[in-house]
Amino acid sequence: MEMLQGLLLLWLLLLNVGGVWTSREPLRPLCRPINATLAAENEACPVCVTFTTTICAGYCPSMMRVLPAALPPVPQPVCTYRELRFASVRLPGCPPGVDPVVSFPVALSCRCGPCRLSSSDCGGPRAQPLACDRPPLPGLLFL
């Protein structure tokens, strides 16, 4: 009986660390690069430009303590950049002296880890998607 309990415990541990879990289709999409449409604008320029880039999104395994009162909170991992590069779009119609170039990150690979406010928005889902205050301009002007 003890051997059976040991095997069951080993199987559950493997399932938890991903050995068995990742070999099958997960219930939720794991952290990975996905295409997303974003918007860029500048207060001094007359239009908003929408563009498609690759962002990190998806599920990261997390834990929650059952008895949280006496222990500090467990840091929750977020889906964030592992590798990225930067691309740019040019906002048309900007007056002289205003930089029309807006740079944005392009996710090359993603990972689950602590949120770095220097490169990620860790605020969670929004009630409304990020949108432009200015009229949108169809079409992309990549540099």
From Swiss-Prot:
One of its GO terms (cellular component) is cytoplasm. Disulfide bonds join C31-C79, C45-C94, C48-C132, C56-C110, C60-C112, C115-C122. Keywords: Disulfide bond, Glycoprotein, Hormone, Secreted, Signal. The keyword Transcription regulation does not apply. Glycans are attached at N35. The keyword Glycoprotein applies. It holds the Pfam family Cys_knot. One of its GO terms (molecular function) is hormone activity. One of its GO terms (biological process) is G protein-coupled receptor signaling pathway. Its main location: secreted. Belongs to the glycoprotein hormones subunit beta family. Promotes spermatogenesis and ovulation by stimulating the testes and ovaries to synthesize steroids. This is Lutropin subunit beta. The lineage of its organism: Eukaryota, Metazoa, Chordata, Craniata, Vertebrata. The gene is LHB.
